[in-house]
Amino acid sequence: MEFKATELRLGLPGITEEEEKKIIHGSSVVKNNNKRQLPQTSEESVSISKVTNDEHIVESSSAAPPAKAKIVGWPPIRSYRKNSLHEADVGGIFVKVSMDGAPYLRKIDLRVYGGYSELLKALETMFKLTIGEYSEREGYKGSEYAPTYEDKDGDWMLVGDVPWDMFVTSCKRLRIMKGTEAKGLGCGV
């Protein structure tokens, strides 16, 4: 067994010392290509590979690197929220409606209704109850339920206490309470 076959040295496998010196001094194509070459078996294949590698180097240096593709996906959260808030202004104002004793919630659009009377009729048909007529003195007369709403400040008020436009802008959610629970919210309830 030869000593050269079992010798441990630093360098690329399968390359002789002469080839390694060529690589270090820059006379080899391998340095320009940044890829390891397999050892060639014949002179003819070596010359063919050098020609193709030289052509490849010329082509790659003259061509511009490929442009990065634009990443397509969700927009940043801030833009998404801005757009959704803008669309909400154009669309409806949806609020949740709950009723004491009912195991479900509903959601309604306040912009669909033109005033309190239309809203109350819709709530009566939605929950199959009678709310009665609202008066500032007596509240909701003739009903065991009183419609209330939570405003921007978190206060619960009777539906009908403020003008309709102010109600639409300040209402966060609606709740149809029992009349006994709504006693402290308005006059004569």
From Swiss-Prot:
Domain PB1 positions: 92-179
Extract the InterPro entries matched here. Answer: AUX/IAA_dom, AUX_IAA, PB1-like
What does its PTM field state? Phosphorylated by phytochrome A in vitro.
Q: Does the keyword Acyltransferase apply?
A: no
**One matching Pfam family:** AUX_IAA
Q: Is Transferase found in the keyword set?
A: no
- Induction comment: By auxin.
Q: Which UniProt keywords apply?
A: Auxin signaling pathway, Nucleus, Phosphoprotein, Repressor, Transcription, Transcription regulation
GO CC terms = nucleus
Where is the secretion signal located? Answer: none
Cited PANTHER family: AUXIN-RESPONSIVE PROTEIN IAA17 (PTHR31734), AUXIN-RESPONSIVE PROTEIN IAA4 (PTHR31734:SF227)
State the domain notes. Answer: The N-terminal half of the protein contains two conserved domains I and II. Domain I includes a slightly degenerated ERF-associated amphiphilic repression (EAR) motif which seems to be involved in the activity of transcriptional repression. Domain II is required for the correct degradation of the protein through the SCF-mediated ubiquitin-proteasome pathway. Interactions between Aux/IAA proteins and auxin response factors (ARFs) occur through their C-terminal dimerization domains III and IV.
| Role summary | Aux/IAA proteins are short-lived transcriptional factors that function as repressors of early auxin response genes at low auxin concentrations. Repression is thought to result from the interaction with auxin response factors (ARFs), proteins that bind to the auxin-responsive promoter element (AuxRE). Formation of heterodimers with ARF proteins may alter their ability to modulate early auxin response genes expression.
| Quaternary structure, from the entry | Homodimers and heterodimers.
Protein name as it appears in the record = Auxin-induced protein IAA4
